[in-house]
């Protein structure tokens, strides 16, 4: 499982011009699922991301986690995180999980984050989405379960 995590002042996702998820201060998480991923990876990645100390304390040092700052999370499915561009000019997505597994683990990830006490919004799995954000810092990390 792979995630691109961006610290944001705000983020929003639209489907067909209609807002389906929006947050204020928090994290935008683009989430990709691999074929071998299980609930174990979901649990690990959700806890890791929620606990990342990437928000600034009063001294300007990245020392606080999402829950410590009362932040929110917007989770967007992103199978293209497993795109392989090493051959040719068109990416191959054979490294991404099949849609049925990816959707199941994506929803499980959202549920785990929610159970950790984080207000969570989502995009729409499998839809063409417009994602907008105000990246704060910028702070952008790639977090993987393996």
UniProtKB/Swiss-Prot annotation:
It comes from the Bacteria. InterPro entries: Daa-tRNA_deacyls_DTD (IPR003732), DTD-like_sf (IPR023509). Keywords: Cytoplasm, Hydrolase, RNA-binding, tRNA-binding. A motif (Gly-cisPro motif, important for rejection of L-amino acids) lies at residues 137-138. Gene3D superfamilies: D-tyrosyl-tRNA(Tyr) deacylase. It is found in: Cytoplasm. One of its GO terms (molecular function) is Ser(Gly)-tRNA(Ala) hydrolase activity. Its EC number is 3.1.1.96. GO terms for biological process: D-amino acid catabolic process. The keyword Cell membrane does not apply. It catalyses: glycyl-tRNA(Ala) + H2O = tRNA(Ala) + glycine + H(+); a D-aminoacyl-tRNA + H2O = a tRNA + a D-alpha-amino acid + H(+). The keyword Nucleus does not apply. GO terms for cellular component: cytoplasm. Pfam families: Tyr_Deacylase. A Gly-cisPro motif from one monomer fits into the active site of the other monomer to allow specific chiral rejection of L-amino acids. An aminoacyl-tRNA editing enzyme that deacylates mischarged D-aminoacyl-tRNAs. Also deacylates mischarged glycyl-tRNA(Ala), protecting cells against glycine mischarging by AlaRS. Acts via tRNA-based rather than protein-based catalysis; rejects L-amino acids rather than detecting D-amino acids in the active site. By recycling D-aminoacyl-tRNA to D-amino acids and free tRNA molecules, this enzyme counteracts the toxicity associated with the formation of D-aminoacyl-tRNA entities in vivo and helps enforce protein L-homochirality. HAMAP family: Deacylase_Dtd. Belongs to the DTD family. Homodimer. This is D-aminoacyl-tRNA deacylase. It comes from Desulfatibacillum aliphaticivorans. The lineage of its organism: Bacteria, Pseudomonadati, Thermodesulfobacteriota, Desulfobacteria, Desulfobacterales. The gene is dtd.
């Amino acid at each position: 499982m792979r995630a691109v995590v961006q610290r944001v002042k705000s983020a929003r996702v639209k489907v067909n011009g209609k807002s389906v998820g929006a947050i204020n201060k928090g994290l935008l998480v683009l989430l990709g699922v691999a074929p071998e991923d299980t609930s174990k990876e979901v649990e690990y990645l959700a806890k890791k991301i929620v606990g990342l100390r990437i928000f600034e304390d009063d001294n300007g040092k990245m020392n606080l986690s999402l829950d410590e700052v009362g932040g929110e999370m917007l989770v967007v499915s992103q199978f293209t995180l497993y795109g392989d561009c090493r051959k040719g000019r068109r990416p191959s997505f054979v490294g991404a999980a099949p849609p049925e597994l990816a959707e199941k683990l994506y929803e499980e990830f959202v549920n785990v984050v929610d159970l950790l006490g984080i207000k969570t919004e989502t995009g729409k799995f499998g839809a063409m989405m417009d994602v907008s954000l105000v990246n704060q810092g910028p702070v952008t990390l790639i977090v993987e379960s393996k």
